[in-house]
Every structure is written in C-alpha cells, then in structure tokens.
C-alpha cells in the first residue's frame, strides 16, 4: 500500500510540474508576442534597402543609443548593454525537440559590448566553450530580438562584470554554479550588479524569461518573411 501510494504521489507531483511548465510556457509566449506586436505597432517605415531586400521601421524613443548602426556598409545590432536573443533553438537537426525547445525555452543570447562586438558562450563546441568575445553577426539571422535594460544607470557596471567572466567554462548541468550557459551569463551579470534589476524568474534562465522580464524593454526586432524580405524594427 505504501509503495503504491508513493508511486501515485510521485506521478501526480511530476504531472503537476509538467503542467506548470506547459502553462508557464504558454503564458510567456503570449506575453512575448504582445510585447513584440506592441513594439512593431509603434514603428514607422523610414527606409528601404531594395538591393538587399531590407525594410527599416523606426520606433521613436528618447535615447542617445540607436539599436542598429551601419558601419563600413554593414549593419550591426545593438548598443552597449543590449541583450540579443534568438527564439529558435540551436538544435534544428533534432525534429520535435527543436520545436518544443523553441516554443518553451528559446535559443541563444549575447551581450553587446559595442556595435561590432558581443560577449557570448556556446556549449555546442566543446573545444570552444568558454565566455568569449565574438564579432557581432546577429543581423544575418532570420529573426532576432534585442532587449534593453530599463535601468540604464547600471549598464557600465554590468558590462565590466560580464567582461570579468571571459574564459569561464560552459555550465552543462544547468544546476551547479560551476560556469554559465548563454542566457544564465546574461542574467547573472545583471543580478550580481543589481538584485532589483534581475532579468529572470529566479529559476533556470531562458531566452523567454529575459524577453518576458519587467526590467527590460524591446529595443530591436527583425524577421524575414516568406519572400526573403527582412523587416527591421529599431529605436532611435
């Protein structure tokens, strides 16, 4: 009897956790969709790069930091302190898992150091799995979301904090504090500077958590339509 009770109790607990995870994922995606749509609704078409199939839409905002820059003929997303996020999971080669991860978790994240440079960590390549500087190539993605900390006064300290983590190994366990995974690197770098500006929900940090956070606002979004036209929404 005790064994049977324990079995059923454990099963209900696991089902409860699964149900919570599903509901939380659905709610997060609804909120994210609303945030993106609200951001896009504020935009006005201001330019078009016909040759490269790009349309630019500006969201007017009081800021000295535009969220896209053109340097030497190339486009770079983000200003110092912005976080770039990819909704798609990094595992397109694994059907079903890729779709589920994309919906419930999201994909990769990067911290913008300057227009041309990001700080990231990638666990797919075990020979190159440390916090490192990267060239900012995020404009080449089919879809990208950029968020900006609402409290801009901490950006300088957060930037120095994340720079201090260069060389730290990837955390494959997601549980122990022996390294970082990409989105965890973003949230930890903010939280260690200012607890009140935390950008996750005090659990395992996902891309969805960061986009959904009340302490960030969307500053950039682009997607590529089925005609391969890239629609770019940015603040200026």
Placement of each model-derived feature along the sequence:
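N-terminal Lys/Arg-rich, disordered targeting/topogenic segments
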Residues: 1-8
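Activation targets extended, charge/polar-rich intrinsically disordered C-terminal tails
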Residues: 2, 20, 24-51, 55, ...
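Sec-dependent N-terminal signal peptides
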Residues: 8-18
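Short, structured beta-strand/loop micro-motifs enriched in basic residues and often containing a Trp
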Residues: 54-69
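Glycine-rich catalytic cores of cysteine/serine-nucleophile enzymes that process amide/ester linkages
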Residues: 72-148, 171-177
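Structured segments of extracytoplasmic/periplasmic soluble domains
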Residues: 87, 121, 160-169, 188-196, ...
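Extracytoplasmic/secreted proteins, especially bacterial periplasmic and envelope-associated proteins
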Residues: 105-108, 157, 161, 181-188
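A structural motif
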Residues: 148-166
